[in-house]
Amino acid sequence: MAAYKLVLIRHGESAWNLENRFSGWYDADLSPAGHEEAKRGGQALRDAGYEFDICFTSVQKRAIRTLWTVLDAIDQMWLPVVRTWRLNERHYGGLTGLNKAETAAKHGEAQVKIWRRSYDVPPPPMEPDHPFYSNISKDRRYADLTEDQLPSCESLKDTIARALPFWNEEIVPQIKEGKRVLIAAHGNSLRGIVKHLEGLSEEAIMELNLPTGIPIVYELDKNLKPIKPMQFLGDEETVRKAMEAVAAQGKVKK
């Protein structure tokens, strides 16, 4: 029997997802469709009767607004929320702002897949002359980060390396206290948590596509090991379509 339940939700589609651009640490907001996804995710949690005690999210508005929208739908906007850069999306470095299909046409789909999906190969770094360098690196929300902590680009391995200490030190104690935890974050920071929970290989986590705006439920034993595979809250068709849409990103438009 499950000792704990954990709910993860990847933010709804952002304005830059809609334009098929690499977002990374750029603070893109939700698109209208992404807002609807978050609403549906919240309604699925409401319909299933979920209650939470504490929430965690990144410092990026697409995840924060997804969380707000979910909390509104379940009428739990009063819950405490912890925001941290450690749950931010992977930093896509010099690729930030580029259209994924155009990048695939220029560098080849195989190279784009390596940058997007390889475990330990980072994209090219974001140099000071990048159009979004000041927008990200000089943003005051990151003023307390040391030079070592503030990335210019990240591989998935790098993203997981900065997300997992927060998971272990801040989130795990809350779960073990019996708190019902909701995490609203990003595809790659959530991948880190999923890889850790399920003990997935580097290859397996690279191929895992988490759908946007759909609550992911884990039932965990007392050692925080899943007692069954992740479950999605939502109808099967919604879940299938969402996962296919994520897999289709980064392919050359025919």
UniProtKB/Swiss-Prot annotation:
As stated in the Swiss-Prot or TrEMBL entry, residues carrying the post-translational modification Phosphoserine are S14, S23, S31, S118
Residues with PTM N6-succinyllysine: K251
* N6-acetyllysine modifications at: K106, K251, K253, K254
Keyword Acetylation assigned to the entry: answer is: yes
For this UniProt record, the keywords arranged alphabetically read as follows: Acetylation, Glycolysis, Hydrolase, Isomerase, Phosphoprotein
- Residues binding substrate: 10-17, 23-24, 62, 89-92, 100, 116-117, 187-188
State whether keyword Coiled coil applies: no
InterPro entries tied to this protein: His_Pase_superF_clade-1, His_PPase_superfam, PG/BPGM_mutase_AS, Phosphogly_mut1
* Xref: PROSITE patterns: PG_MUTASE
Site annotation Transition state stabilizer: residues: H186
**Enzyme class name:** isomerase
Active-site residues are: H11 (tele-phosphohistidine intermediate), E89 (proton donor/acceptor)
Q: How is it modified after translation?
A: Acetylated at Lys-253, Lys-253 and Lys-254 under high glucose condition. Acetylation increases catalytic activity. Under glucose restriction SIRT1 levels dramatically increase and it deacetylates the enzyme.
Q: Which NCBIfam families match?
A: pgm_1, PRK14115.1
Which family is this protein grouped under? Answer: Belongs to the phosphoglycerate mutase family. BPG-dependent PGAM subfamily.
Q: What does the UniProt record say this protein does? A: Catalyzes the interconversion of 2-phosphoglycerate and 3-phosphoglyceratea crucial step in glycolysis, by using 2,3-bisphosphoglycerate. Also catalyzes the interconversion of (2R)-2,3-bisphosphoglycerate and (2R)-3-phospho-glyceroyl phosphate.
What this protein is called in its record is: Phosphoglycerate mutase 1
This chain's source organism reads Mus musculus (Mouse)
